[in-house]
């Protein structure tokens, strides 16, 4: 029970916290928007523990989890509402996803890749961070923001989240500027 409460009240960093932009630089790559069903949500923690993830000290926080500690696995509405979607088993490893098709699945791997997306979300504000924290699998949402590249200010290193054979566009970092919850829960994924 304690774990559930800690997940429910987990803090999500956002760009209005003083230490976040002192330690990370964001470079916009383009606009992002879409209507999706949330397949899964996963939290990440940095490799080492500190008192506060957005400390104003520059250079001590070289882990992407200090600016983005939540990933969302999303499916396009057309795909998520189909019975075929239930024949796909998703697994999130590290900061990206992998999938396995059931032997009876009529889908091809390319169809799954074309209709799914894993984002490492960066909240633009405290309000967006609170909304992202409340997101649940099965909900239909609209997200708007920007594709971004994240660089550590102290090392100059860019953070990569896609270490798998999926196309680079399927696992990306997004600065979320707007979040809207739509209607009731849609079809559940297995």
Which sequence ranges carry the predicted segments?
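OB-fold and OB-like single-stranded nucleic-acid-recognition modules
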Residues: 1-190
């Amino acid at each position: 029970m304690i774990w559930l409460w800690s997940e429910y009240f987990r803090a999500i960093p956002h760009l209005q916290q003083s230490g976040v932009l002192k330690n990370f630089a964001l470079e916009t790559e383009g606009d992002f928007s879409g209507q999706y069903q949330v397949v899964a949500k996963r939290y990440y923690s940095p490799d080492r523990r500190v008192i506060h993830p957005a400390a104003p000290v520059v250079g001590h926080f070289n882990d992407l989890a200090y600016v983005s500690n939540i990933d969302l696995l999303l499916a396009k509405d057309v795909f998520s509402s189909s019975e075929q979607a239930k024949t796909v088993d998703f697994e999130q490893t590290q900061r990206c996803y992998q999938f396995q098709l059931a032997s009876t699945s009529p889908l091809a791997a390319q169809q799954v890749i074309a209709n799914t997306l894993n984002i490492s979300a960066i909240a633009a504000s405290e309000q967006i961070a609170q909304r992202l924290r409340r997101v649940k699998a099965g909900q239909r949402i609209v997200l708007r923001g920007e594709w971004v590249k994240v660089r550590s200010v102290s090392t100059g290193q860019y953070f990569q989240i896609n270490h798998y054979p999926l196309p680079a566009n399927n696992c990306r970092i997004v600065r979320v500027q707007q979040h809207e919850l739509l209607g009731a829960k849609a079809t559940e994924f297995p």
